[in-house]
């Protein structure tokens, strides 16, 4: 009975997370950049919307903020828009110099994810990437 109770609780949290992502999308002033206050499971939900290009959310392990590319569809590894080529593989000061964002921390070589130390920094990077 305890196992069943735990599974029901997990399902409730999962549906609450889905609702939180839908709410963030609905309330986003810019539908191309969706900011989540927690690291929710967002990929299948936002890939089914037309507008989102990037999602900004906290990294629950490091405290950094993540800028993640939204995929063309939930089963694809193809992003709608990649982060700028000039950011690829850059870290710390090298990334700060190219972005102008003081707390920029990292951009993956494949340009599908980047990080900053603040939500504001991550959103600024997402806006720059959108215009690139």
Model-derived features: where do they sit?
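C-terminal accessory domains and tails appended to enzymatic cores
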Residues: 1-132
């Amino acid at each position: 009975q305890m196992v069943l109770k735990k599974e029901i609780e997990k399902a409730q949290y999962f549906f609450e997370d889905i609702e939180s992502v839908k709410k963030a999308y609905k309330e986003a002033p810019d539908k191309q950049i969706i900011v989540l206050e927690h690291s929710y499971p967002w990929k299948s939900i936002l890939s089914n919307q037309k507008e989102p290009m990037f999602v900004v959310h906290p990294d629950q392990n490091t405290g950094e903020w993540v800028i993640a590319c939204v995929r063309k569809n939930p089963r694809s590894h193809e992003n709608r828009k990649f982060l700028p080529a000039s950011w690829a593989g850059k870290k710390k000061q090298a990334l700060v110099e190219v972005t102008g964002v003081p707390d920029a921390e990292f951009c993956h070589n494949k340009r599908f994810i980047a990080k900053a130390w603040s939500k504001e920094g991550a959103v600024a990077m997402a806006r720059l990437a959108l215009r690139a």
